[in-house]
Every structure is written in C-alpha cells, then in structure tokens.
Amino acid sequence: MKALLLGAPGAGKGTQAQFITAAFGIPQISTGDMLRAAIKAGTPLGLEAKKIIDEGGLVRDDIIIGMVKERIAQDDCKNGFLFDGFPRTLAQAEAMVEAGVDLDAVVEIDVPDSVIVDRMSGRRVHLASGRTYHVTYNPPKVEGKDDVTGEDLIQRDDDKEETVKKRLAVYHEQTEVLVDFYSKLEGEHAPKYIKVDGTQPVEAVKAEVLGALGK
C-alpha cells in the first residue's frame, strides 16, 4: 500500500496515520524525518541539504525527491509506505510521477475550518509538564489553571485563532491543487482518491479509512 495522507492541521491526521501504518505494516514517511535522517547519516544529499538549511534556505525539490527515492528503496518500504505532508506542492507531485513514484491511494481527512478553529484555539497547555486541556472538551478543574500544580495554563501562539486561520488558508491553497492533480491522473499512475469525514469519532474515521483501503 503506497498512500498519501492529507488533512489540515488539527484534522486528526497523526492519529489516523498510526492506524494505517499498523494495519499495513508500512512506515510513515515525512520530509522532516527524512531530512534529519539523511543529514545525520551524512549522505551526499543530506550534506547538500544541511548546507542549504544552515544558510537559512529552503531545500530544493530535486534534493527532496532524491531523498524520497532513496528512502522508499529501503527494506521497510517493500510493502509500501505512507507519505505524510509530502508532496506539498504541485511541482513536487509532478516530479514524483516523473520519477516513477506512483501512489495506490490518496486519503483526505476532511474537517470544516470552523471545527478546526474551535479544536485548536480552545487548547490550553501547562508548559512545564506538557499537560494539555481544552476549554470545551477537556477543561481544567479551575479555569486557566493546571489540575496538578495550580500553575497558569497558556495558549500557544500556534493555537491562536488568527494563526490557525492563516495555516488553514495555506493548507487549502496547496491541497486543492494536489487533489485536482491526483484526481485527473489516468491509467496506471492514477491513485484511488478517498475523502473521509473527519468530524466523526476517531474509531469511525479509522473504520472508514481502513475499509476504503481494503482492510
């Protein structure tokens, strides 16, 4: 099973990724992990990427695609892989097809923006322990205070409504192009496109995703 998982920040993609990788015995591949591994291993592509990152630049697509090809040639990918957050752009998706990296399925966890804003902007965190609360779904016993220590809870910058809305706008801009690209592919290159309602309970989303993937 060679699949790509799409979902906005806060859509519950990470949870579903764990279910998919466990069900099919395949690794989850993210560009961040791949870059770190290549840099640590000191591969030629890793060294080139490190130089660009150290200079504050963005790693070029040709380096990323090269790393992807190296990564999916490894033994643990013989039954397939799950791409998470890659490809991000139309150029990357096109380069993947040109490089002969085909996908069996593209899975999108679909959650309305209003639900995601509510999920993320309601998060509160106790920094010292990492304990996380939600003002609606998992509130602390005392508003704004950690249950264990009584210390203040904070709202991370990433979870502020304006930030969440900006991230969603970027996600839609990128993803709509990808969805359009994959849905128009024909013949052997065409993956199955699966859109799942991510507002359902976690187990229901899991059942629908795995069912659509043939498990």
UniProtKB/Swiss-Prot annotation:
Q: Which NCBIfam families match?
A: adk (TIGR01351), PRK00279.1-1 (NF001379), PRK00279.1-2 (NF001380), PRK00279.1-3 (NF001381)
Question: Which positions does UniProt annotate for AMP binding?
Answer: 31, 36, 57-59, 85-88, 92, 156, 167
Identify the stretch(es) annotated as LID.
Answer: 122-159
UniProt organism field:
Neisseria meningitidis
- This one is known as Adenylate kinase
Present the record's domain note. Answer: Consists of three domains, a large central CORE domain and two small peripheral domains, NMPbind and LID, which undergo movements during catalysis. The LID domain closes over the site of phosphoryl transfer upon ATP binding. Assembling and dissambling the active center during each catalytic cycle provides an effective means to prevent ATP hydrolysis.
Pathway note: Purine metabolism; AMP biosynthesis via salvage pathway; AMP from ADP: step 1/1
Segments for region (NMP): 30-59
- Predominant location: cytoplasm
Gene Ontology terms: cellular component: cytoplasm
Q: PROSITE patterns from the entry?
A: ADENYLATE_KINASE
Q: Report the sequence similarity comment from the record.
A: Belongs to the adenylate kinase family.
Q: Which gene encodes it?
A: adk
Catalytic activity, per the record?
Answer: AMP + ATP = 2 ADP
Coiled coil feature spans: none
Q: Which domain of life is it from?
A: Bacteria
Tell me one GO molecular function of this protein: ATP binding
Q: What is the effect of changing residue 201 to A?
A: In strain: HF4, HF8, HF16, HF79, HF85, HF110, HF113, HF116, HF147, HF175 and HF200
Describe the effect of residue 5 to F: In strain: S3446 and 020
Known function: Catalyzes the reversible transfer of the terminal phosphate group between ATP and AMP. Plays an important role in cellular energy homeostasis and in adenine nucleotide metabolism.
Instruction: Give its localization.
Output: Cytoplasm
Can you tell me which residues bind ATP? 10-15, 123, 132-133, 200
Subunit info here reads: Monomer.
Biological process terms in GO annotation: AMP salvage
Which InterPro entries would you find in this protein's record? Adenyl_kin_sub, Adenylat/UMP-CMP_kin, Adenylat_kinase_CS, Adenylate_kinase_lid-dom, P-loop_NTPase
Q: What is its EC number?
A: 2.7.4.3
